[in-house]
Regions:
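Catalytic-core segments of class I nucleotidyltransferases/pyrophosphorylases
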Residues: 76-78, 85, 91-98, 112-114, ...
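Residue-level signal for inorganic ion chemistry
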Residues: 10, 36, 68, 83, ...
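Conserved hydrophobic/aromatic beta-strand scaffold that supports enzyme active sites
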Residues: 106, 119, 149-151
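A short, conserved acidic/glycine-rich loop-to-beta-strand motif
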Residues: 100-110
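Conserved N-terminal catalytic core of the sugar/cofactor nucleotidyltransferase
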Residues: 3, 7-81, 90-92, 108, ...
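Acidic/His-rich active-site region of diverse nucleotide-sugar glycosyltransferases
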Residues: 60-62, 117-133
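A structural signal for short hydrophobic beta-strand segments in well-ordered beta-sheet cores
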Residues: 1, 119-122, 173
Length: 173
């Protein structure tokens, strides 16, 4: 847990999400899982109710979400990496997703040099037409980079294999 202002960075994230109304939080844990559980407890200190799902082997970003499916299959859900520090209004992003027919919405941001990120090309209706994870210099077709923040409809689970290492950016998009 990386400390920021005398708190683990994930505590800032949980507080931010709870302040926006995302109070039921599922955290998939593997590496440093015990430290994360000790730091956050049940989440009540941060205005949240936290459920932990252990990952015995590395399953990747989408695989770990699939591993937590039983806690996420009732409604669309937000996916945010535990190492994210953001002040983005993810509630607005969530609401935009709810108003669309999309199975998944990917948070995008315009940046100067997108080589270290997944990039997307969108059409006039904001639908993603192409996505490439960490493009080589000759493969860059957009400066819209993935934030690694997604809103997923539970239908997404139909596209993620069980007990398999599977990443949103590399394997699903």
């Amino acid at each position: 847990c990386i400390p920021v202002a005398n708190q683990p960075s994930i505590a800032h994230l949980v507080t931010h999400l709870a302040d926006l109304g995302f109070t039921d939080i599922v955290i998939t844990i593997g590496y440093l899982g015990d430290d994360i559980q000790k730091a956050l407890g049940d989440g009540s200190l941060y205005g949240a109710n936290i459920t932990y799902v252990s990952e015995e082997v590395k399953l990747g970003t989408a695989g770990s979400v699939k591993n937590a499916q039983k806690y996420l299959e009732d409604a669309p859900f937000l996916v945010v990496g535990g190492d994210h520090m953001t002040d983005l209004n993810v509630l607005e992003f969530y609401r935009d997703h709810m108003a669309s027919p999309a199975v998944t919405s990917i948070g995008l941001i315009s940046i100067e040099d997108p080589r270290e990120f997944g990039i997307a090309e969108i059409d006039a209706n904001l639908r993603i037409r192409r996505f490439r994870e960490k493009p080589a210099p000759g493969e860059i077709f957009s400066n819209l980079a993935s934030t690694g923040i997604y809103v997923c409809d539970p239908m997404i689970f139909d596209y993620i294999p069980e007990n398999t290492k599977f990443d949103f950016a590399k394997d699903l998009f």
